[in-house]
Each structure stands twice: as C-alpha cells, then as structure tokens.
Amino acid sequence: ALPAAAAALAGAGFVHRRVASLGQPGGIEMFLDGPGASPRDAVHVLLAGEKVRPDSPLPTPDVTEAEPADGFLLLGLEALVAMKLAAFRDKDRTHLRDLLELGLVDESWLGRVPQAVRGRLEELLRNPE
C-alpha cells in the first residue's frame, strides 16, 4: 500500500520521508509538499486497520469507513472521532473540542464510539478545557 501511495504522491510533487517518533517503531511516514517543505505541513500517512502505536486502544479506521465526496473518499465523522479519541494527543483533543463546540459531537456520541475510547470522550464532555 505504501509504495503505491508514494508513487502516486511523487507524481504530484510530494517527497516521501520517514521520521522518527517516540513510541512509534519504524517512525511516521509522511509526504512533504516539495523538497523544502516542513514536516509540520506534510501529509501524514496512516495505513488502514493498523495501530499507530502498539499501545493504541484501536486500529486506524478501515477504508470501508470512508464516504464518497465530490470525486474522492472522505473518512466518515464517526471513524474520524474514534481515531482522534484513540490517538488522544493534544492536537487530537483540540480537534475534538472543536467538534464539540460546533455541536457535531455531543453526549449522544457516547453510544456511538467504541467502548475502548468512550472514557476519553466522557472526559472531554466533563471538562472541555
């Protein structure tokens, strides 16, 4: 899967890099928007159905959880929320708070997210800050 993605992205001018990450065996795969681009602005690639870290409570969503959107596939909101809850880094919590503030996620979601990450959503609902 990764070689095919690398070839497709290289054709669009992206440069493949693997960078080290704490707790991530083998590092993180990313594609920079040209040779001088920063990893902060890169496209980060996660393979479907695999755990990002060995201790992650859930694997990444399967490709079947994507929805058609104007000529491409877009990860569905439920799958995105579960992925953000599984990663639960500061930036993921920030994205989840944004979804809460916009009303796209609320208490009714407690029954929609996997049990393995439900406590994390409860934590954000109790204390969004």
Located regions from the model:
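Compositionally biased terminal segments of proteins
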Residues: 1-129
